[in-house]
Regions:
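N-terminal carbohydrate-binding accessory modules
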Residues: 179-180, 254-327, 581, 588
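Short, aromatic- and glycine-rich surface loops/edge beta-strands on solvent-exposed regions
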Residues: 128-131, 247-259
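Beta-strand-rich binding/interaction modules
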Residues: 96-98, 189-222
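Substrate-binding/catalytic cleft of secreted carbohydrate-active enzymes
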Residues: 334-579, 585-590
Length: 591
């Protein structure tokens, strides 16, 4: 593992020229108190959690303990303005000091945050940074996904602390804090609004749109823009290139502020796409997902985003790109990002490659009664999948406390606001299999208030309340029978055929849904499932497929890739051929 991992710019949708990456070796200590440790335990490779092999530590942060980080740093080149310290994600709650001054903190293990550290900097240099972290894992109500202190089966080792890039940038005194970009496919426009750091909220802007390096639309601060703090630019018809998996066109966007002297103005770079999601009946009256007005078969994989050396954190940006490119080359167009939020570069690569993302809200809440929410409901799914998620059920689902429900609302808003700039995100998934579920109908309303451009899968698997756009089925054990519904039918989890590939076996007991004994058997069972079970259901209304899963994860050996991503387990040519057959059958069905 390199000593300066993940050096790439971490925020592609809001870029500046100033950038100083702080990934690398830091000092660390694990103690029983929040105070600065008397001594350091050793070095940790940031941004890898201490529980991971890649960190060089291999220790688990227990609830109630404190994880401390320390390093020196040099601010970005330049003078004046403000210096911002950015964290891609820290799990879960942290306090940050610079030169002994508390500069801020954050709670929430999956979302980026920035702190203005200018006033704490040492004029003579020699700046020092301390970060103190606590993580309750399964003892709290916060979002935690598949993390557990007792890993096994479908649950994985807990991790804590800094797990995404840490970086610095120098900005003007009045800088853009948030950029809201709203494309309108039907109107062929994009509306850009920015908020700035100084009082007053929205900024007066100029904006330029480029397509393939050619300027196609611009607004240099008109009176109309100055009045409402936003600019709307029209895309010429000859440069109207809708985004899709077959043609993932991205427009380049440059935005700047117009207030003050030139050195006080801010300029940022971004991008956007023109695409439109909808649900509509096909020629036979069966509800289908539509992208840019045309029915589309969403054919994808469940993606949990774990890596053997770094757990949540990939070994390199290149490894991420190679995996996504291979998935696309195998003929898939969809990834369901399951119980995790990725670093923003992951979504950027999906934007560029044309991979559609269904994004789960990361599950949290109190302890789940797994005997009910997972095992009993799975076995008796035909009877239980539409149980009302009313208050009497909240204790079984881990949402009995008001604090837990308030935490979920805060996390939902943070998730949508963080990721809605990415055109690859096509569907929000508020709940999965009842984990932490409550008032799914209210969650759908909250999502649509924040983003009305995407689909919503209200409750993936079960405890479906009849809302959202998707009738979302999980099926590992029963014969698959689909019939047309008022919502579009998705098979949002299925398959999961296990095979512990020789040389890539799991560290503990192998886990999956039925086990193959060889590559040939795995390939044959995959083909039979897809062509004999799934394909006939397309004409009955099945419109989205999410096979479990991208890769093996810890004990789970039901991935198409091995855990280390070194091999594709079934025959790749067979996978491509099956996906082509599914696409051809769907096209014939909706003609």
């Amino acid at each position: 593992m390199q000593h300066h991992p993940l050096p790439e710019y971490p925020r592609p949708a809001l870029r500046r020229d100033s950038y100083e990456n702080l990934n690398g070796l830091w000092q660390y200590a694990i103690t029983g108190s929040a105070g600065l440790p008397a001594k350091w335990d050793g070095d940790i490779l940031v941004p890898y959690s201490p529980e991971t092999k890649a960190s060089g530590v291999g220790r688990t942060l227990q609830p109630g303990a404190w994880l401390h980080y320390h390093r020196s740093f040099v601010p970005p080149a330049g003078t004046g303005g403000r210096v911002l310290l950015h964290f891609g994600a820290v799990d879960y709650a942290c306090a940050v000091q610079v030169n002994g001054h508390l500069v801020g903190g954050h709670r929430g293990g999956y979302w980026p945050f920035a702190l203005d550290i200018t006033d704490a900097l040492n004029p003579a240099g020699h700046d020092r940074l301390w970060v103190a972290v606590q993580d309750p894992t399964g003892t709290g109500v916060q979002a935690r996904g598949k993390q557990t202190l007792r890993p096994g089966g479908m649950f994985y080792p807990a991790q804590s602390g800094i797990w995404q890039t840490v970086w610095l940038e120098r900005v003007p005194e009045n800088y853009i804090t948030e950029l809201t970009v709203t494309p309108d496919y039907d109107a062929r426009t994009v509306t850009v609004k920015a908020h700035t750091s100084l009082p007053g909220g929205a900024a007066n802007l100029w904006a330029v749109v480029r397509a393939g390096g050619v300027t196609i639309a611009e607004d240099w601060g008109s009176d109309e823009a100055d009045r409402d703090g936003a600019v709307t630019l029209h895309i010429p018809e000859e440069h109207f290139f809708p985004w899709s998996p077959d043609s993932p066109f991205l427009y380049d966007l440059t935005v700047g502020t117009t207030q003050g002297e030139e050195e006080q103005r801010d300029t940022v770079h971004s991008y956007f796409a023109l695409r439109k999601w909808s649900c509509a009946p096909d020629v036979h009256g069966i509800m289908r997902f539509c992208l840019n007005g045309k029915p589309i078969l969403l054919n994808g994989l469940l993606d949990q985003g774990y890596w053997p050396e770094g757990l949540y954190t990939p070994p390199s940006d290149g490894a991420v790109v190679r995996e996504l490119q291979t998935i696309k080359e195998l003929g898939f167009n969809l990834l369901r990002k399951h119980a995790k939020i990725e670093p923003q570069r992951w979504y950027y690569h999906c934007d560029k490659l044309g991979l559609i993302v269904w994004q789960d809200m990361v599950n949290g809440g109190g302890p789940y009664k797994l005997w009910f929410v997972t095992y009993l409901t799975n076995v008796f799914q035909p009877l239980l999948r539409r149980l009302p998620d009313a208050r009497p059920l909240w204790g079984l689902l881990g949402r009995e406390t008001e604090a837990g429900r308030e935490e979920y609302a805060r996390e939902l808003e943070a998730t949508v606001k963080t990721l809605q700039c990415h055109p690859c995100v096509g569907c929000w998934v508020p709940f999965n299999e009842g984990w932490g579920q409550f008032d799914a109908a209210g969650a759908v309303e909250a999502v649509r208030r924040l983003d009305d451009t995407c689909l919503v899968d209200e409750a993936s698997g079960w405890y479906d309340q009849g809302g959202g756009d998707v009738d979302s089925l999980h099926n590992y054990f029963y014969p698959l029978r689909v019939r047309p519904r008022s919502r579009v039918v998705a098979l949002s989890e299925y398959g999961g055929i296990a095979w512990p590939m020789p040389g890539h076996e799991p560290p503990r007991r192998a886990y999956g849904y039925g086990t193959a004994k060889s590559r040939a058997e795995l390939t044959a069972r995959w083909k039979k499932l897809q062509l004999e079970t799934v394909l006939p259901q397309l004409k009955k209304g099945l419109s989205a497929l999410v096979y479990t899963q991208v890769s093996d994860v810890e004990d789970e050996v039901n991935g198409l890739f091995t855990y280390d991503r070194a091999a594709i387990k079934p025959d790749p040519a067979a996978v491509r051929a099956v996906n082509q057959a599914l696409e051809a059958a769907f096209e014939k069905t909706v003609e």
